[in-house]
Amino acid sequence: MKIVVLQGSPNSKGSTNILVENFIEGAREKEHEVVRFDISKMNIKPCLGCVACGYEGPCVQKDDNEIIKKALLPSDMLVLATPLYYYGMSAQLKIVIDRFCSYNYSLTGKHLKSALLTVAWNQDDWTFEALVSHYKTLVRYLELEDQGMILGYGCGNVSMTTHSKYPQEAYQLGYSL
């Protein structure tokens, strides 16, 4: 299986990255091909809302989003990885998702498998409600097949994350595919 991981944290050595690395390790042990994009290091502009693409055509913006598109369309799975910022996904990840607009119909109906990897400082039971709702809406709209969510409560720094159960859960999710 070909898996595309969109790593949406601007902190390449942070808690989100720990989950991503563990997920990838598990998936590769099962001999899956994994392509990882560290979005914050890429040149991807926000959607202009011009709809010149007609929801299924070339985007007027020429940037690194085309690299993601070329990897994602022939893939079997999409993994969204993000820290929780103000109870939602990072702006970096949201920009990429908004840019799905130009290949909307190609994504919808592919029935890609999907997963969500996320971390937050908070430990309140409601911490991830808005993000999970957004993810589930994307799953429904894009006709994805959710394989699981790793919701890393209380992962405010690398030490907290490393000593939590979540890296192992991310590994297990990757290995279970």
PLM region descriptions:
Residues 105:
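Conserved adenylate-forming
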Residues 91-92, 108-149:
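Short, glycine-/small-residue-rich phosphate/pyrophosphate-handling segment
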Residues 1-81, 87-102, 151, 159, ...:
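N-terminal beta1-alpha1-beta2 submodule of the flavodoxin-like/Rossmannoid cofactor-binding fold
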Residues 125-126, 157-159:
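Short active-site-adjacent structural elements
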Residues 84-86, 121-122:
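Short glycine-rich anion-binding loops that position phosphate/pyrophosphate groups of nucleotides
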Residues 10-11, 121-123, 154:
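Short, glycine/serine-rich, charged loops/turns that create anion-binding
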